[in-house]
Design a protein with these regions (language model features):
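Core beta-strand-centered patch of the WYL/Sm-like small regulatory domain
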Residues: 1-76
Length: 76
């Protein structure tokens, strides 16, 4: 996979997500990797599991805290 320019042939994961502002939305992403790291936006700055993924709606690479995924819709 080209991480900077994912293609439509990649598997897309859909889920409902609550961001650090408390806003809830459905997201469509192409997962890149899962890591543990500190983030000012997640888990009060303590280390947590993060999915790094290409967000298809925002057209950029984003970090998603796994603990903030509310519901998985599956792979589409």
């Amino acid at each position: 996979m080209n991480k900077e320019n994912p293609t439509s042939s990649e598997e897309v994961l859909r889920f409902r997500y609550k961001n650090y502002k408390g806003e809830i939305s459905d997201r469509s992403v192409i997962p890149i990797r899962t890591i543990v790291k500190k983030s000012q936006y997640h888990n009060e700055g303590k280390p947590c599991w993060i999915m790094v993924a290409y967000d298809l709606d925002k057209e950029e690479k984003r970090d998603f805290a796994l603990q903030d995924i509310i519901k998985y819709y599956g792979i589409i």
